[in-house]
């Protein structure tokens, strides 16, 4: 995923589980149905999904706030998450029946009156002091269905709460937090198109501690596991509580053998990573859960390469790519790998946005996926081919195109559209020489923090453009010796993040998809907040030095900004209530950059911590 060889951020406080303050009146809350969720992309009174729809396009049809009046936005209210529990606030909120559901750092969730900003209830998870989040004590959001709201906790549990009261309905552990399992991403609700069963889908986190990543589907009423899919080739999945099928080839040929190992494979295979720690999208037509798979463990590519061999001969499947999983069985139907045998921690977790792509050669529309990867390339893949097994041996590639969206990429010059493989430059970090503790340092761009990180992009069907919060930066990078030890960081790489250019780091990029073109929106500090588009013609995002900003979606002109008092590393939403359009975003600096960002951490050290949510609307005179 995204941090250094330093010790993980340690928690020392025990947080008491509470459901506090006022509960919601029964008449005020209606159950959320599957039809509500399936229509989230076109309804305007609620925000029911992470991504504003099953396709994760993050586009709203609302247009009361437009390019002519967005400069008049004013705060409607703000809400403090309170206490000393600040750190990074990375969540996207949900909105239903006039109530906002907002998760916050340290595994907390709040129900807030959307009209007044009044707290209705609060739930604080009881966290042990031996949890191991790699990249801050963050939470990125919740899911909502029926009369419940769901979110994950840093001690590797999924929790269901009564939406009216905040009381726990069920809680399920899915991994051992002491060895590194945790959860930071928002869960997602889908409906199996074959059985008609509604499922709660979520992944695990923990690649940096050498744990195998898993994708889970649960019964939202009981929390019971329906299926579970490991993301490392050859590991066994589960269905209805029993072993089902291995992921890919049971012999795991993309990972080297080791005759001296009890498993017959190299150590890394047993600890192989691939955690799907971000939130899924859902391909209804093909009945597939679509999600990014994380980096292999350890980062050290030589630990996943046969002795004396070329790392490019090994893929470390099924890591650092986009996975297509059968909603009925949990079988891996297809896979596209962005970075084979990933040596740079580029991972593959960034959002996978589903859209319809017009083939410029034939004019035909293709059911496609779009993904802006940390490796600096923007990918378009064919979903229908992935539903038929693309990515497996002897199957054609699903890759339609791959375009760079940042400058100065050092690891590859492009992609072969026939094979789907990168055209690598000779830029993998060398092994330590005999007797040395570390290898020779190399210059890498983008760094492991990525050309863009997890912060989700948006897609506007009005402009046909994707809007990516991108960064121009680099790192010095060297290999270190590493052996697995339970509960310890399992990297085998050292690094120092640094500037690529003197005049900027963050940049808002638009891609159509074709060669990326800049919208002209650059910043001195990293761009580490998600984007939102609307039919009003603007793009909304935040900056790590505390601003919320609106840009013209056609030309990138800055139209409005507001200083929140702390860095913005979250994801904006918009909805309509009482005839008015609202915009909301969280403020509170944290995440990977201040912890592991090297020179970039120095660049933002003046940014104060915070923990708040801001809600905006137009004054009456401007409507």
UniProtKB/Swiss-Prot annotation:
Binding sites annotated in the UniProt record for Ca(2+) 1: 40, 43, 46
GO cellular component term of the entry, any: membrane
Binding site for pyrroloquinoline quinone: 90, 140, 184, 202-204, 374, 592
Induction: By butane, 1-butanol and 2-butanol.
Region (Disordered): 235-274, 420-440
EC code(s) of this entry: 1.1.5.11
UniProt cross-references to SUPFAM superfamilies, sorted A to Z: Quinoprotein alcohol dehydrogenase-like
Consequences of knocking out this gene: Cells lacking this gene show a delayed growth on butane and are unable to tolerate high level of 1-butanol. When both bdh and boh genes are inactivated, growth on butane and 1-butanol is eliminated.
GO terms for MF: calcium ion binding; oxidoreductase activity, acting on CH-OH group of donors
Gene3D superfamilies the record matches: Quinoprotein alcohol dehydrogenase-like superfamily
InterPro entries: ADHI, PQQ_b-propeller_rpt, PQQ_MeOH/EtOH_DH, PQQ_rpt_dom, Quinoprotein_ADH-like_sf, Quinoprotein_DH_CS
Residues noted as binding Ca(2+) 2 in the record, renumbered to the chain: 208, 295, 345
Top-level taxonomic group: Bacteria
Protein family (similarity comment): Belongs to the bacterial PQQ dehydrogenase family.
Protein name, UniProt field: 1-butanol dehydrogenase (quinone)
Organism field: Thauera butanivorans (strain ATCC 43655 / DSM 2080 / JCM 20651 / CCUG 51053 / NBRC 103042 / IAM 12574 / Bu B1211)
């Amino acid at each position: 995923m995204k941090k250094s060889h330093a010790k993980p951020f340690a928690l020392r406080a025990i947080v008491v589980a509470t459901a506090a303050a006022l509960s919601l009146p029964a008449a005020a809350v209606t159950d959320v149905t599957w039809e509500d969720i399936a229509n989230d992309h076109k309804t305007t009174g609620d925000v029911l999904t992470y991504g504003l729809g099953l396709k994760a396009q993050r586009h709203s049809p609302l247009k009361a706030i437009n390019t002519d009046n967005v400069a008049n936005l004013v705060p409607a209210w703000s809400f403090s998450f309170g206490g000393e529990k600040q750190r990074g606030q990375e969540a996207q909120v949900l909105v239903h029946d006039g109530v906002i559901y907002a998760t916050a750092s340290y595994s907390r969730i709040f129900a807030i009156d959307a009209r007044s900003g009044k707290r209705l209830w609060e739930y604080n998870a009881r966290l042990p002091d031996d949890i191991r989040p790699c990249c801050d004590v963050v939470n990125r959001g919740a899911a909502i269905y029926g009369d419940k709201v769901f979110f994950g906790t840093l001690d590797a549990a999924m929790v269901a709460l009564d939406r009216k009261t905040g009381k726990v309905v069920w809680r399920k552990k899915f991994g051992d937090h002491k060895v590194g399992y945790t959860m930071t991403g928002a869960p997602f609700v889908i409906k199996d198109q074959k059985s008609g069963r509604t499922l709660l889908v979520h992944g695990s986190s923990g690649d940096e501690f050498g744990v195998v990543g898993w994708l889970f589907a649960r019964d939202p009423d009981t929390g019971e596991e329906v299926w579970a899919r490991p993301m490392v080739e050859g590991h066994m999945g589960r269905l209805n509580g029993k072993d089902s099928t291995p992921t890919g080839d049971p012999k795991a040929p993309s990972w080297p053998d080791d005759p001296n190992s009890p498993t017959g494979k190299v150590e890394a295979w047993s600890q192989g990573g691939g955690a799907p720690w971000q939130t899924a999208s859902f391909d209804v037509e093909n009945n597939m859960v679509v999600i990014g798979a994380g980096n292999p463990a350890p980062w050290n590519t030589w630990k996943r390469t046969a002795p004396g061999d070329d790392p490019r001969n090994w893929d470390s499947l099924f890591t650092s790519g986009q996975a297509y999983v059968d909603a009925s069985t949990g079988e891996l139907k297809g896979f596209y790998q962005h970075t084979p045998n990933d040596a740079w921690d580029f991972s593959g977790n960034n959002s996978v946005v589903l859209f319809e792509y017009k083939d410029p050669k034939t004019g035909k529309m293709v059911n496609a996926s779009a993904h802006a990867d940390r490796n600096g390339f923007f990918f378009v893949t064919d979903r229908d081919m992935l539903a038929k097994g693309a990515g497996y041996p002897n199957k054609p590639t699903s890759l339609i195109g791959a375009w760079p969206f940042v400058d100065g990429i050092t690891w590859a010059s492009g992609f072969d559209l026939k094979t789907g493989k990168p055209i690598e430059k000779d830029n993998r970090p060398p092994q330590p020489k005999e007797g040395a503790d570390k290898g020779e340092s190399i210059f890498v761009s983008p760094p492991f923090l990525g050309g863009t990180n997890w912060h989700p992009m948006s897609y506007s069907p009005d402009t046909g453009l994707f809007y990516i919060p991108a960064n121009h930066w680099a790192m010095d990078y060297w290999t270190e010796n590493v052996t697995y030890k339970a509960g310890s960081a399992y990297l085998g790489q050292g690094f120092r993040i640094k500037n690529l250019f003197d005049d900027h780091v963050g940049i808002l990029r638009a891609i159509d998809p074709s060669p990326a073109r800049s919208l002209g929106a650059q910043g001195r500090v990293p761009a580490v907040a998600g984007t939102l588009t609307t039919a009003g013609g603007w793009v909304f995002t935040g900056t790590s030095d505390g601003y919320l900003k609106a840009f013209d979606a056609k030309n990138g002109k800055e139209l409005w900004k507001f200083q929140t008092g702390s860095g913005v590393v979250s994801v904006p939403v918009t909805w309509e209530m009482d005839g008015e359009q609202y915009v909301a975003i969280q403020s509170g600096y944290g995440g990977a950059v201040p912890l592991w960002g090297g020179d970039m951490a120095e660049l933002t050290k003046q940014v104060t911590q915070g923990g708040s949510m801001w809600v905006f609307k137009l004054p009456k005179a401007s409507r």
